[in-house]
């Protein structure tokens, strides 16, 4: 049996608590997911124009098939903010909250992790 001095307990609890917090994520609420789906199909240009995503009924012909890519929400956010390849940036077109909604919708629809 290990002997633990009282001085180390607060630090151990703090580190353990931070470890637990780092592994948790905030689930998107259903209204945010629904808004993300709507934006995916209605933005100009619409994500659905280029990307295939079964959950959105999208059969794009240009960009990656998101159902196969299974990209997480952070990667979708980076692509929306900065653009990637021929995909334009949406930073000047939609709010950060709307970008988050699209990112979480795509991550959930593909089974990828969501922040």
Functional labels for PLM-detected ranges:
Residues 14-26:
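Hydrophobic alpha-helical targeting segments used for export or membrane insertion
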Residues 37-39, 48-84, 89-90:
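Gly/Gly-Pro-rich "capping" loops immediately C-terminal to redox-active cysteine motifs
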Residues 45:
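Cys/His-enriched microdomains
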